[in-house]
Amino acid sequence: MAAGVAAWLPFARAAAIGWMPVANCPMPLAPADKNKRQDELIVLNVSGRRFQTWRTTLERYPDTLLGSTEKEFFFNEDTKEYFFDRDPEVFRCVLNFYRTGKLHYPRYECISAYDDELAFYGILPEIIGDCCYEEYKDRKRENAERLMDDNESENNQESMPSLSFRQTMWRAFENPHTSTLALVFYYVTGFFIAVSVITNVVETVPCGTVPGSKELPCGERYSVAFFCLDTACVMIFTVEYLLRLFAAPSRYRFIRSVMSIIDVVAIMPYYIGLVMTNNEDVSGAFVTLRVFRVFRIFKFSRHSQGLRILGYTLKSCASELGFLLFSLTMAIIIFATVMFYAEKGSSASKFTSIPASFWYTIVTMTTLGYGDMVPKTIAGKIFGSICSLSGVLVIALPVPVIVSNFSRIYHQNQRADKRRAQKKARLARIRVAKTGSSNAYLHSKRNGLLNEALELTGTPEEEHMGKTTSLIESQHHHLLHCLEKTTGLSYLVDDPLLSVRTSTIKNHEFIDEQMFEQNCMESSMQNYPSTRSPSLSSHSGLTTTCCSRRSKKTTHLPNSNLPATRLRSMQELSTIHIQGSEQPSLTTSRSSLNLKADDGLRPNCKTSQITTAIISIPTPPALTPEGESRPPPASPGPNTNIPSITSNVVKVSVL
């Protein structure tokens, strides 16, 4: 054995240093790691729009949906792609985030929809790039404020029945259209505000001269009349302020509010003037107090939506206005200093100091140019021209931002008012539908008023249509949907008074026990032939509808003691014929029952696979004339010829 080892050992050593191979065949390659995933292209289908990217691109962020294994739940084995039923426009920004690592906010997208998409993909909005983050935060804040206002208005409407006296009074002050008394008080205060402002202006107009003195203003010549007007206005303003203070939810916040301060400043000069004497030492202070009466004009902001929107605009543009003020201050100081030293050598110069040059700089930068101070030297004229041009640039920059904010806030308020009006109209229509009877439903069915998406705008025609269109229509349509979904059968409309015989197809019958006995009794009182209703037609083995309610003819029931209104409603009552589902190509569904019937269809009654079931419309309320005059249901007589029903009965609740 030692000899054998000695024989091949030199060859192994020679092969180790590369002199000769150990074997004639090459050695096999090292086994590859099969678990190592190769990079590949994957397809992301977002609502039909296909996106392609590398798998490693998505795996950069494993904490998100697309970067984790959770995306495998959305993999489609048939198409070999990931399908997401989401917004494809927002997904472009999401995919660019995986590619570049920067998340951007598209300004044309709704902020709520954008947040929902980011939450779905597991991306935090805090990583939005600096170029879009300010815009995103502004839109987020505006949307939150708008939603807060909508929620407050909805809460006020929902909690209306349980409001206290103070809450009712505060609601009347904030929304004068809630009651007639609040609306009257609203217009009365607005009238006295206008009278107060006009009085403050007219009392300074000269009203003739007095012998031996100069012209007297109207306020001094007719002092008693103006004092009475001022007293009446101040009394109204005082009562309004005290009532608002009493009804305010938080009196501390109300006192600190801007409008409360304006109210106090508007009425305090009158009371201070009553206690002040005509001493010359205090006459200057009295004149100063009378100047504050002009602030009463700001009380119009409660009566003007445009003024309130302007205030909101200035508040939202506080940063832009601060930038404008800071820029103007810097420019005024710089150009005032330059103009002072440029005009210092001129003997007739009016630029005596830098603060005196402020006036020229302000007037020049605002492009007013009164001409009371003008430069005399060439250097002063050059710097004055530069000051005028720079003022145009500095002032013009923030103006488009302020205008755009005003337009945006104005349109938001307009849309909010429109939504509140539409919601109020829908609630009123539902309230009318709840108090309506079955005749209103049948009347709307007969006239084809089935447009539930109608929005009321205040016209008399639309108001009448809103009253006749009730909620029962949508409930009836939904019930028929559920019946077809449960049984797999098609439903056809027919007249119950022309055919009340029952036959079984698949042991299904839908019947309302509330009116079954009375319908049987009424059908036994008639002597109609036992033929099928002419409201059914057959075409190629399929059954379609031909609603007989479209005809205007009224059929009077013989030997019936029921009122005429009840007979008409019973003639308009519908039954539902059920056809077996052996034929898979049925073209009639429950959704067509609430549509207008095709008047061009020819009635044909040669079908045998029909069974009759009755679904009754709710009986009129006891408060209606029909409910009062309708007799109680009687048991069927002995002559009632109705075959026994051996099928299962499915009881349908009354709509």
From Swiss-Prot:
| Region annotation (Mediates dendritic targeting) ranges | 474-489
Q: What start-end ranges are recorded for coiled-coil regions in this protein?
A: none
Tissue-specific expression: Highly expressed in brain, in particular in the retrosplenial cortex, medial habenula, anterior thalamus, hippocampus, cerebellum and lateral geniculate and superior colliculus. Highly expressed in heart atrium (at protein level) and throughout the ventricle wall, in lung and vas deferens.
Q: Which residues lie on this side of the membrane: Cytoplasmic?
A: 1-182, 247-253, 307-318, 401-655
Region spans: Disordered: 523-565, 616-647
- For this entry, list what GO says about its biological process: action potential; cellular response to BMP stimulus; membrane repolarization; membrane repolarization during ventricular cardiac muscle cell action potential; potassium ion export across plasma membrane; potassium ion import across plasma membrane; potassium ion transmembrane transport; potassium ion transport
What's an example of a GO molecular-function annotation for this chain? voltage-gated potassium channel activity
- Answer whether the UniProt record assigns the keyword Zinc to this protein: yes
Q: Which residues carry this modification: Phosphoserine?
A: S153, S569, S585
PANTHER family attached here?
Answer: POTASSIUM VOLTAGE-GATED CHANNEL SUBFAMILY D MEMBER 3, VOLTAGE-GATED POTASSIUM CHANNEL
The family annotation for this protein states:
Belongs to the potassium channel family. D (Shal) (TC 1.A.1.2) subfamily. Kv4.3/KCND3 sub-subfamily.
- Can you say what this protein is called? A-type voltage-gated potassium channel KCND3
Which species expresses this protein natively? Rattus norvegicus
Query: Which gene does this sequence derive from?
Result: Kcnd3
